[in-house]
Amino acid sequence: MKRYYLLIILSSLIALLSCEKINYMYYLEKDSNMTFDLNYDVEPYIKALFPYTDKDGHQYISFQNGFKNQIVFYDIQTKEMAFKIDLDIEGDNGVGFFLGYYIDSLDSIYLTSLQLPEIYSVNKDGKINKKIYYGKSKDGNVLNACNSLSFSYHPILKFNNNLFVLSECNRWKYPNPVSAMIDLNTGNVQELPFEYPRFSGADNKKKNAGVELYFSRCFNGDKFIYSFFYEEDIFITSIDHNIVKRVNVKSNYIDRVVMPNDYNGTLKSMCENPNYGNLLYDKYRNVYYRVCYLKTEIDNRENYMELWDFGRKIFSIIILDKNFNIIGETVFPEYTYNPNLMYIDEKGLYISENHYKNPNYDDDKLIFRLFRLCKSKEKYNDSAV
């Protein structure tokens, strides 16, 4: 009998101690917004948007002006356009048509060609520093053009005087690498040993690139992290891509992803069915944010292409710690935010409110809402309002 009571007492003590150990989870809490008044000739349809801080610590939001050969810079403090860079299409400093870019400095901005495996390095005056061709690796393998975008978040990156670029998927050839590395000293192009994953049920090569076309990539200073939109797992690679680790990062709100049907798939189904989206690294808090598009229904009268461009109807964001453990997930209200337009600074995560079905939408303004990373005692029950 004494042993019985002793067990009860021990169990009670363990329970009390367990209550003291609070398993803090995290969520994204809505904060203030920031509004940029767009100049009359600046378009709100943005595929490439990146923050930039100059050598004096001055902060800007930069983005390509629609599909024009122009990058605009807005001052984050004044909320006004600070300057713009116009790029010639033809002539001595002609770069052709470009889509996407990466800013190393204002003296070294890398532009990715719209359709060709070419990159131009230019300065803030639009003068060409260098033209880089990456259509064939040093081993003779063909690489495909891929743009440096934020819409599908996979900007190119300069690290240790190497430029890490992407190669669009081509299921017809082998090898089929996701990325390549360009030595900026020698110009050598080396394909990296990480290939596009194969997805069951997506083996029809007649469909252009298949679902592998949609993916996101970020860099934490030590590793590259890939998020394919129709794959639960993320892929973590070493800088040289010789080591690849696969980690499951499943949304609490997605049972399974639904791939577009090769023959009968429509934009409507791509707006309704669940899948994953962009992955961003927050260097200030050492966490990651993975967008998840949740299953929903769309009115048949909706413009599906426009809805796709503006971030669909409803999404959540998974929060991962530095070891890629899920520590929270926040669901966002329908038709309010555009997760295709996000950026991060020392205050938190900014998500654009430029969704055409948002009642406050104005195509003469670019609006971002700040979300701060906060602790919560509740697991997976958080939603942004």
Regions found by a protein language model. Give the residues of each.
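Beta-propeller fold detector
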Residues: 32, 36, 81-88, 129-141, ...
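Structural signature of eukaryotic scaffold interfaces centered on beta-propeller domains
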Residues: 47-55, 99-104, 148-160, 208-220, ...
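Asp-box/WD-like beta-propeller blade repeats and closely related beta-sheet repeat scaffolds
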Residues: 124-160, 166, 170
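Beta-propeller blade signature
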Residues: 176-187, 305-323, 364-378
